[in-house]
Amino acid sequence: MLSHNTMVKQRKQQASAIMKEIHGNDVDVMHLGKKVSIPRDIMLEELSHLSNRGARLFKMRQRRSDKYTFENFQYETKAQINHNIAMQNEKLDGINLESGSQQAPFTPPNTPDPRSPPNPENIAPGYSGPLKEIPPERFNTTAVPKYYQSPWEQAISNDPELLEALYPKFFKPEGKAELPDYRSFNRVATPFGGFEKASKMVKFKVPDFDLLLLTDPRFMAFANPLSGRRSFNRTPKGWISENIPIVITTEPTEDNTIPESEDL
């Protein structure tokens, strides 16, 4: 088993190797060419300065990783020591089991012998048989639930008015009362004595209107002077304005060619 100082030294060596890998080692560096090595050198040089925010964040992360590495060293060493102790205990237990394998297996007390048949007295002492003297339970019976009745309800149970006051009920609509049969005078005005005895001296005759005048075109033109004005709100029509049907004949047309002159 390694001593504590030796483990501390090994841990520090591992931490220094990790830090060398992070910061870079000029001795063991693979030559990757100018396109890779020069930008990497520029990037590492920029990160080494604390002029920009990215470099400051990079330094903070480096310090945090170093702090985590050295602070967790004590916890990891304790865990490793506990693991080694557990491994030694397991080895000792294995040696003890090998040495005691020739002894008889340990059985807990009050365990029945599996070679003998089971005895009811041993399994459940005091049990003689099924309980035949006790009547069986009756199922499918309606159980009446018991409810609590307060002393106030018991005191006013004989007084219905108090019960109604204790448990208010909703109001029910009352029936409509029958309206009295009054005589209505809201009628058409009638002359005294009725229409038969009314005076017939004044007679009104509805004048006769000549409805033909309303349809007279002269009256319509006079009533609407804009009716004779030309309207341009018309639908588009074809080349033939009179809507004459076109007749297509299959007979050969006559040769109406114009004779050419001598100049042509």
Swiss-Prot record:
The Phosphothreonine modification is found at T107, T111
Comp. bias intervals (Pro residues):
106-120
Which superkingdom does the taxonomy of this entry point to?
Answer: Eukaryota
**Entry's localization field:** Cytoplasm, Myofibril, Sarcomere, Z line
Q: Which residues carry this modification: Omega-N-methylarginine?
A: R53
Keyword vocabulary terms for this entry: Cytoplasm, Methylation, Phosphoprotein
Its predominant location is cytoplasm
Sites where Phosphoserine occurs are at S101, S116
Q: Does the keyword Cytoplasm apply?
A: yes
Question: One GO molecular function term?
Answer: actin binding
Look up the record and give one Gene Ontology term from the biological process aspect: negative regulation of calcineurin-NFAT signaling cascade
Question: Which residue ranges does the record annotate as region Disordered?
Answer: 98-134
Record-level GO cellular component terms: actin cytoskeleton; Z disc
The family assignment reads: Belongs to the myozenin family.
Protein role: Myozenins may serve as intracellular binding proteins involved in linking Z line proteins such as alpha-actinin, gamma-filamin, TCAP/telethonin, LDB3/ZASP and localizing calcineurin signaling to the sarcomere. Plays an important role in the modulation of calcineurin signaling. May play a role in myofibrillogenesis.
Query: What does the annotation say about its assembly with partners?
Result: Interacts via its C-terminus with spectrin repeats 3 and 4 of ACTN2. Interacts with ACTN1, LDB3, MYOT and PPP3CA.
Supply the name of the protein: Myozenin-2
Species this protein is from: Bos taurus (Bovine)
